[in-house]
Amino acid sequence: MRTAAHTVSTPLQGGYVGRTITHAPAWGGLVTWDMLFNGISTGLFLVAAICDLAAPSIFARAAGAAFALALLFLVVDLASLVFDLGDPLRFHHMLRVVKLGSPMSVGTWCLTLYSLPLTVAAATGVLPSEWMSLEAVRRVAIVVGLPFALGSAVYKGVLLSTSAQPGWKDARWLGGYLTSSAITLGGAGMLTLSLLMGEGRAVAALRFALGILVTVNLIPLGLLVADVRVALARAYRLPGLFGLAAVCLGGGALLPFYLLVVNDITGLLVVAALCIALAGLAIRFAIVRLPHASS
């Protein structure tokens, strides 16, 4: 009796070496805005906190407004994050355990713990100033919130760079860039608030500081670009790469630096801050797009 022949599948020559076997996440504009709002909120808090602790006579008024604005951006950021997860309960489920070895768990807890002192710091700005104990409460809240704000700023970069997604897995400087960018965005936000509130001494100090931040931010950005240069070459044609470089380097660094250093017109200083934010958005969009270029 003739036996049926068994079909044996032959593995691909060379196996899976050099092959992409992951599926790109179904992320788009929402997660890009989530990353931007996270950077603005944490950066505003970090810059305002340091300014308020170092020179309250100069920055206290603008810092109070910055804490309230940072809380608003955090609420929008968390809403974007929850909608991006698809199920609002998923964020809640991540709070049931603490895994110090998991960037997702650490980041979720940092966001939660950051929101508490931020809320206190923002609330003290709207309560009656006659309450003398409020200043002490605000300072304690600021100090307590600093490490959690820093953790919230850095965790998304660490989370993406430890994934298996093409482009992200090579982005070892992503956490460093997002943290540096958050502080730069915070400086731009503080400068804008100081301008709108007529805080001349704060504006003078923040213009100088923001010029330094914009320049220093180019270092982690350059290291990040070096990490993901292969993925960028797959994601963009040459004209697209030049366009992205023009937006990020020209619009996000050179133009703002020029406006900050040689210009005294209030409107143009606001333009400098806006350019920094738009460049940050463009870079985050390019980061989110990297795995899709290899799928």
Predicted regions and their residues:
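N-terminal signal-anchor module of multipass membrane proteins
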Residues: 1-57, 290
